Amino acid sequence: MTVASYSMVLCGSSDDHRYRGRIEKVKFGVPINEAFAHDIPATLLMLLLKVNKDGPAKKDIWRAPGNQAQVRKLSQVMQHGRLVNIENFTVYTAASVIKKFLSKLPGGIFGRDNEETLFNSASTGMDIEKQRQVFYRIFGSLPVASQHLLVLLFGTFRVVADSSDGHTNAMNPNAIAISVAPSLFHTCIHDGRTARVEDLQRFKLASNIVCSIICSFGDTKLFPRECYEYYARYTGRTLRIDENRMFTFHNPSSELFY
């Protein structure tokens, strides 16, 4: 199942029989191991692939909200496990539903303790290489489904950021980080009360961490190779490694000119 096949979530694919003949319910607001019994549910995966494919050309993607009525409708359809034509929803709605799913994960995708570890690594003046090592260790401790979700997310953030100069999306790594950090790092959210100085500091740290991961995407010391391979396979790209030991991703059409 690749980016080219997301339009109607129907009956599976040649490489993953678990999607055949049924649609898994997407559970909002439950722990990740309950939400992802096997791996990323089909509909959520298709939303990620839609944003990965169409998002780079869309202005303010990840920052501009989707239509709230459509966000509620799509969320309900996903929770009931009903068939859905993804093409009936805008890429902004897709991105908003993804952020909603992340924001409702109890403790966040990383967990409170891991968030604190990442904040400490970013706030103590630790050099960027050691910060990557901390992230790599935390990433490796997460369930495989969480790893798959994160590598698809950050790969998508990166392709959007890479297009910020050539398109009108205006979403460079810092702009994306500011827009998505609260969905990924729940301890930087101030729970509706008046924001304190420390809340703002944590939000800034969270944004800096997300921005750094986006900019480092492809680094061999950030995500394991098998996760980069997962990202390449599901987005329909070819994985290569360059002279700087960085993984790079190429669309099939660009292979003719490589």
Regions found by a protein language model. Give the residues of each.
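HEAT-repeat alpha-solenoid elements in large eukaryotic scaffold proteins
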Residues: 154-157
